[in-house]
Amino acid sequence: FESLPVKPDITICVFGYLGENETARAHWQEAEKIIHSNYTGAVSILNVVSNFYAKQQKGTIVGISSVAGERGRQSNYIYGSAKAGFTAYLSGLRNRLFREGVHVVSIQPGFVYTRMTEGLSLPPLLTAKPEQVAEAVYRAIEKKINVVYVKWFWRWIMLIIKCIPEFIFKKMKL
């Protein structure tokens, strides 16, 4: 970032690695790859960007996180925990940078048709196209929205999932 001749006014952090949950449970290297891809890598980049924007007292940071980070589920809890950390990071960054004139956006897309989800059996109604994610990002930047669920119903789906008492939730196969 430091070596760029012209710094961007908007930084969009959009990368992720779902990984193999079963492999990650058995082999730390896979878990580490998931964590570094979804949390450590993003934070290392955005720390540099956020400090620059804070000094400039302007800029926009967009982080693509995941609804998977809103509640740990057996099917992807390592990926979900990394995204939970990233979502919390974005929230803290937003809190820190608001008074500096920097806008921080968290995008919670739900399922998206990408290379990362190729081969997965995704429910079409719940799955966004990359163009829908791009439109949501653009709208959030233009309207200074803080948290965006690409498909509106994900906000309510996750609210319901988060409200399930733990003694019931732990018995569910999600």
What are these regions (language model features)?
Residues 71, 92-103:
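Active-site-adjacent segment of SDR/Rossmann-fold oxidoreductases
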Residues 46, 82:
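Active-site helix of classical SDR
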Residues 10, 16-32, 75:
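Conserved mid-core segment of classical short-chain dehydrogenase/reductases
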Residues 66:
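Residue(s) in the substrate-gating loop at a strand-loop-helix junction
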Residues 109-119:
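Short, flexible catalytic-loop segment of classical short-chain dehydrogenase/reductase
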